[in-house]
């Protein structure tokens, strides 16, 4: 259901694939993505990344600085967001730049619609 890989995950999801996805696969995919949002801190990280201009990425340390959490906690939340398909990262020297997976908000919305309609 995704296209475009980086070292730390998928860069973009293909919205057209939802049309041909069966209902059970759709529910499984929706559950996977929902797990990523199952914590208020992860929702805040997604919100921060969503508000960022698409051509600019957060350095992971910027996210740590913006949240009242230890670096290890933020890293754990970013790891879960990557594993569940919300975020990808790219190496930039000694730093990792984080961004939302392209089309992920629309993809999530369409999965919800399809899961409810069928």
Could you tell me what each predicted segment is?
Residues 1-37, 84:
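N-terminal leader segment of winged-helix/HTH proteins
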Residues 27-31, 105-116:
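Hydrophobic alpha-helical core bundles mediating ligand binding, dimerization, or RNAP-core interactions
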Residues 28-70, 92, 96-103:
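N-terminal helix-turn-helix DNA-binding core of bacterial DNA-binding proteins
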Residues 45, 79-80:
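Hydrophobic side chains within alpha-helical segments
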Residues 65, 76, 82-83:
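Alpha-helical residues within the helix-turn-helix
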Residues 73:
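Residues in the helix-turn-helix
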Residues 76-77, 94:
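Base-recognition residues in the alpha-helical recognition helix of bacterial helix-turn-helix
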């Amino acid at each position: 259901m995704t296209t475009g890989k980086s070292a730390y995950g998928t860069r973009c999801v293909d919205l057209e694939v939802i049309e041909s996805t069966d209902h059970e696969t759709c529910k499984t995919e929706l559950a996977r993505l929902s797990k990523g949002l199952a914590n208020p801190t992860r929702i805040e990280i997604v919100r921060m990344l969503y508000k960022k201009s698409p051509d600019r990425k957060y350095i992971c340390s910027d996210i740590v600085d913006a949240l009242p959490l230890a670096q290890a906690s933020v890293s754990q939340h970013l790891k879960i967001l990557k594993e569940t398909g919300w975020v990808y990262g790219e190496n930039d020297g000694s730093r990792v730049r984080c961004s939302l997976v392209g089309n992920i908000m629309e993809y999530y919305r369409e999965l919800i619609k399809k899961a409810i309609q069928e």
